[in-house]
Amino acid sequence: LRVATTSLAGCFGCHMAILDIDERLLDLLQLVEFDRSPITDIKHCGPCDIGIIEGGLCNAENVHVLREFRANCKILIAIGACAINGGLPAQRNHLSLSTILEEVYHAQHGLVDGFIPNDPELPLPLDKVHPIHEVVKVDYFIPGCPPSGDAIWKVLTDLISGREPELGHGLIHYD
């Protein structure tokens, strides 16, 4: 089985939680081949069986990466609060984008001639932060901020074994 991971708008804590599988990660590496992930440093995802994605959608580049990633994954797992409901980045959703940009680039004390960047190399921010299921089909959700390594291990080993993943209450928590 091929597994790929990627991160959108978030803190990368969910990828750190994957490392919390600890020595079981070595067992996992005997069962799967990692494609795109920080473990392999592969930047583009090829066809894979299981895709794991963390982070919400804050800008146009996030949406592009998500759609491309989903197109290459037979099964997509949303991992963590940011991917599932927007998480901390979605705290900005009660303000308009123009208000946020004005506050950051013009209203801060000490700014001289502040301007809002308008460079084609920068991804366009979205008006609101969105969870990934609003844009693509998600097959499984692993909640938490971050989810526990045990929850990630349980879902992955269930899928690898052909079982439907089931997380008990003891595996779902927010730290």
Regions found by a protein language model. Give the residues of each.
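Iron-sulfur-associated redox domains of electron-transfer enzymes in respiratory
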Residues: 1-175
